[in-house]
Curated annotation (Swiss-Prot):
Induction: By nematode infection in roots. Down-regulated by salt stress in root meristem and replication blocking agents (hydroxyurea and aphidicolin). This is Cyclin-dependent kinase A-1. The gene is CDKA-1. Belongs to the protein kinase superfamily. CMGC Ser/Thr protein kinase family. CDC2/CDKX subfamily. SMART domains: S_TKc.
Length: 294
């Protein structure tokens, strides 16, 4: 750890404290994540180290670069490139955020590019939310943070400071207890983030797992076998769920054009096997005026 000097604590993430730090060798500013593991006394599981080492290979302009992994005194430190703004802070501090439809489109495109890259490397995120989408103010580029960490460390119910980990962006198949979920879980999260950028408020702000499910059902309709094959066999599905009819998504994103509504509805299909994938989403008509961003 001698190579890095902590400058200040900048936050408390899902897995531990995040510091702004300086690389003493290159003088570069970096973000240092100290991973707090459940079994402190046992040190770092070798599976976690293997998973994390694979992430160092991931290189893409829309992914926050994992520069180094330091295993020191039973602690794991992850060294990332430093970005000081996330999408949540940006939305909260920009009253007219939802009016800049072109910027929202470029952000969504970049999110999908990062996800398509990760999915092509068989890496899921599982915990996408505005807080882990980082923005480089100089270039207005957006980068996904914390990709692959859920597989290495699991997703806790609460952070180490006892904050509840948000459920607002969690896909229905996870909430219903599926153990065989895959890349569509990230697309669901992106749909929720897209809707939030457009309306500047969360689409499904649940405060418990059942409340989260019911908030989804009230808008998207309660799923049943005809609309989602196999749903009634999922561990947490109950035949006693209230039967809500689907509503019109447009009413929640009134300033989104028809192409945008079409893309959003394809991302928020309840049945994960029917949900659009990241590559297909990038080819959607909604992005045609971007002229294939670099």
């Amino acid at each position: 750890m001698d190579q890095y000097e902590k400058v200040e604590k900048i936050g408390e993430g899902t897995y531990g404290v995040v510091y702004k730090a300086r690389d003493k060798v290159t003088n570069e500013t970096i973000a240092l994540k100290k991973i707090r593991l459940e079994q402190e006394d046992e040190g770092v599981p070798s599976t976690a180290i293997r998973e994390i080492s694979l992430l160092k290979e991931m290189q893409h302009s829309n992914i926050v670069k994992l520069q180094d992994v330091v295993h020191s005194e039973k602690r794991l430190y992850l060294v990332f490139e430093y970005l000081d703004l996330d999408l949540k802070k940006h939305m909260d501090s920009t009253p007219d955020f939802s009016k800049d439809l072109h910027m929202i489109k470029t952000y969504l495109y970049q999110i999908l590019r990062g996800i398509a890259y990760c999915h092509s490397h068989r890496v899921l995120h599982r915990d996408l939310k505005p807080q882990n989408l980082l923005i480089d103010r100089r270039t207005n580029s957006l980068k996904l943070a914390d990709f692959g960490l859920a597989r290495a460390f699991g997703i806790p119910v609460r952070t180490f400071t006892h904050e509840v980990v948000t459920l607002w962006y969690r896909a229905p198949e996870i909430l219903l207890g599926s153990h065989h979920y895959s890349t569509p879980v990230d697309i669901w999260s992106v749909g929720c983030i897209f809707a939030e950028m457009i309306s500047q408020k969360p689409l499904f702000p649940g405060d418990s797992e059942i409340d989260q499910l019911f908030k989804i059902f009230r808008i998207m309709g309660t799923p049943y076998e005809d609309t989602w094959r196999g749903v009634t066999s999922l561990p947490d599905y109950k035949s006693a769920f209230p039967k809500w009819k689907p509503t019109d998504l447009e009413t929640f994103v009134p300033n989104l054009d028809p192409d945008g509504v079409d893309l959003l509805s394809k991302m928020l299909l309840m049945d994960p096997t029917k949900r659009i994938n990241a590559r297909a989403a990038l080819e959607h008509e909604y992005f045609k005026d971007l002229g294939g961003m670099p």
